[in-house]
Design a protein with these regions (language model features):
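Short, structured segments at the rim of ligand-binding sites
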Residues: 39, 76, 411
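N-terminal accessory interaction module
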Residues: 44, 54-55, 60, 66-98, ...
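Short loop/turn segments at secondary-structure transitions that flank enzyme active sites
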Residues: 65-67, 90-92, 111-113, 185, ...
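Compact, glycine/acidic-enriched structural inserts
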Residues: 82, 86-144
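Acidic, carboxylate-rich catalytic segments that either coordinate divalent cations
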Residues: 381-423
């Protein structure tokens, strides 16, 4: 309920009748202040007139005034800057660390706000606001989706920064970790990322002109080369891997759980690893080349890939199948662009301070079709249809970061829902 009070305060949704402190002083809220998501008072730099005198400082909000002492604010100097304590239940006085009293105001709001809040939080419908969406202005929805897309970019940038730290600042290595994870296409993503963490790109680069040796490193580190090879090709790879493992002091992954049950053969980890090996055989500095590409076609051509001849007739070692090229489909390539290339382009642009790179990241998403998954289909049923991949990324962000966590108070659609007075 405290979040609701903060929401009411932030948007000044309380009655406009004269406000007073518990001591009878008049209160005029000039500026409610900036919300604070970290430790300290709830709102910074508020501007409030108390009995005609302008005060600039912080505001703290509680359901009960006694929460001030319960949270030990009376012993925390970070709260000495509070100029007004706002509660829906003033059940005690509040004091700063030096013993001086803090002006308090009881905050009331229309009953429909609480009713709307309960509707959103307690309803079994998903999303709870689905009835309102078709009635909202398109400009409002477009603006919200644009903000969500940027928010998703920033969130992915944080993950990339974590990968960079793990890779000791090596952008190519960090890119490989992310690309490998996304080559798992959900089902094997964790296994692919764990596998990629064991692959030193310096070793791969030294043998980049030899696809067979790259495959030996990749399959060996994946733990997919058996002690008793199932055919001549896997036997040759096993022998080559033993040599390269000794040369580069490689240790194969021991606890990877590759999933293949109820999976299309084209998605088997063997095929995906063979495709990755081919990509790194053909490209010197994969990230560098992708960053230079300015169109979706160029990116698709770089990522199209393929495999060595062996995999034209195999999905796993030792089991022949009718000959079929194992190239990535446009849909799969587009997912790699959306989830790997574009976030790295944005993150690299932020890192270098090159705005044209961050803008290109957004432009590339607008050139791609929206993703087709259950989240996007859900929003379409509610009246929110993605026009391009930028929109679909925004809608994924909306569901995962707002709807699933019931953060309706922080959502622009939720804000419109709270304000509505009709049922």
């Amino acid at each position: 309920m405290e979040h609701l009070l903060q929401f009411v305060w932030k948007h000044k949704l309380f009655p406009l009748t004269p406000l007073h402190t518990t001591q009878g002083q008049t209160v005029e809220v000039i500026d409610p202040g900036l919300p604070n998501s970290d430790a300290g008072p709830d709102f910074f730099n508020a501007k409030i007139k108390i009995d005609g005198i302008l005060w600039v400082g912080n505001v703290e909000i509680h359901v009960h005034a006694s929460d001030w002492k319960r949270h030990h604010h009376h012993q925390d100097r970070a709260y000495d800057s509070v100029i007004l304590h706002v509660s829906s239940d003033i059940d005690t006085e509040t004091f700063r660390t030096d013993g001086t009293p803090i002006p308090q105001m009881e905050l009331h709001y229309p009953p429909y706000l609480l009713d709307n809040y309960r509707e959103l939080i307690e309803t079994s419908h998903y999303p709870a606001c689905y009835r309102l969406i078709p009635r909202l202005p398109k400009l409002l929805l477009h603006s919200w989706l644009s903000s969500l897309q940027t928010e998703r970019f920033e969130q992915k940038t944080q993950r990339i920064q974590a990968q960079l730290t793990q890779s000791k600042g090596d952008w190519e290595q960090a890119f490989f970790l992310t690309l490998a994870r996304n080559f798992g296409f959900g089902t094997n993503s964790d296994a692919f990322e764990q596998w990629a963490q064991t692959i030193p790109l310096q070793a791969v680069n030294k043998h980049r002109d030899n696809l067979f040796q790259i495959e030996a490193i990749f399959f060996g580190q994946a733990g997919l080369l058996q002690e008793l090879p199932s055919d001549d090709y896997s036997a040759q790879l096993t022998k080559e891997y033993a040599y390269l493992a000794h040369k580069f002091e490689l240790q194969p992954s021991e606890h990877l759980r590759w999933k293949m049950l109820r999976m299309r053969p084209g998605n088997f980890p063997h095929v995906r690893i063979a495709q990755l090996a081919n990509l790194y055989h053909r490209s010197q500095g994969m990230l560098s080349q992708l960053l230079l590409a300015s169109t979706v076609k160029e990116l698709r051509d770089l990522l199209r890939g393929g495999t060595s001849l062996y995999w034209l007739t195999h999905y796993v070692f030792g089991e022949s199948s009718p000959a079929r090229p194992k190239t990535l489909s446009d849909a799969s390539i587009d997912l790699l662009i959306i989830n790997t290339v574009v976030p790295f382009l944005y993150a690299y642009g932020k890192h270098k301070g090159e705005e044209q790179l961050t803008e290109r990241a957004g432009n590339l998403l607008e050139q791609l079709k929206p993703e087709n998954n259950y989240i996007i289909r859900l929003w379409k049923e509610c009246g929110l249809q993605a026009a391009h991949a930028g929109d679909s990324q925004a809608l994924i962000q909306l569901k995962k970061n707002y709807c699933d966590t019931k953060k309706c108070l922080f959502c622009r659609i939720g804000y419109e829902y709270f304000k509505k007075k009709e049922g």
